[in-house]
């Protein structure tokens, strides 16, 4: 499997890094928190050959360059929309994993004509939708990073990423109910997102389909 070349596209306040592969309808791939576009390299080369795949690095992740004091899922979604506009893309499918799934929910609401069909893997709209043990882990990591910051270490990027997992993303039930795009939600049998929360999201989105994958967890769904 070859190492896909990183390309860049300039936005007004960021330089988005991405890998492009294949030919066919556009398929945008969105990674999770503290990951990068590289998690999709194998799929781009082996599984999605019938598509022009575009795996993006979100702000504060991978090789994307930006100077931010805060990261938000909504801002990530705005970057994806602007990216597609600047690439001249009029229609694209989306697969988003974890935080990428959260981005996909925003895209479904904001731009259903541009993104008519989306797959959101293990999304959550509320921080409280995370299993309590995992949420405590994130909170402990945040305290550790704040302690290291006081000692003079540069933990800004880590703290911004942790804030994403400890903050509601900003989509209400009414927002989800207004989604017009076709949305499929996938989650793991042993997911770190509460099953009742994922079912709540699916129930709020008109016509959304929901699949649970057996014998896997959030990290290998």
Q: Each predicted region: which residue ranges?
A:
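Hydrophobic, aromatic-rich cap/lid helix
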Residues: 148-174, 190
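Conserved alpha/beta-hydrolase "acid-adjacent" motif
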Residues: 192-197
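Catalytic histidine-centered segment of alpha/beta-hydrolase-like enzymes
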Residues: 216-221
């Amino acid at each position: 499997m070859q190492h896909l070349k990183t390309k860049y596209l300039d936005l007004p306040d960021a330089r988005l890094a991405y890998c492009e592969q294949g030919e066919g309808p556009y398929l945008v791939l969105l990674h999770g928190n503290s990951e990068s576009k590289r998690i999709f390299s194998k799929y781009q080369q082996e599984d999605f050959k019938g598509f022009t795949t575009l795996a993006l690095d979100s702000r504060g992740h991978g090789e994307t360059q930006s100077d931010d004091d805060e990261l938000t899922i909504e801002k990530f979604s705005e970057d994806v929309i602007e990216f597609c506009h600047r690439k001249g893309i009029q229609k694209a499918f989306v697969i988003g994993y974890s935080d990428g799934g959260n981005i996909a929910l925003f895209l479904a609401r904001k731009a259903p004509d541009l993104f008519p069909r989306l797959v959101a893997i293990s999304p959550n709209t509320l921080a409280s939708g995370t299993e309590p043990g995992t949420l405590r882990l994130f909170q402990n990591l945040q305290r550790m990073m704040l302690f290291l910051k006081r000692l003079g270490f540069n933990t800004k990027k880590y703290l911004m990423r942790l804030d994403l997992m400890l903050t509601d993303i900003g989509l209400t039930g009414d927002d989800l109910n207004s989604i017009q795009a076709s949305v499929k939600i996938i989650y793991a049998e042993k997911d770190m997102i509460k099953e009742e929360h994922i079912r709540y999201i699916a129930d709020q989105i008109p016509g959304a389909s929901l699949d649970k994958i057996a014998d896997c967890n959030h990290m290998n769904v």
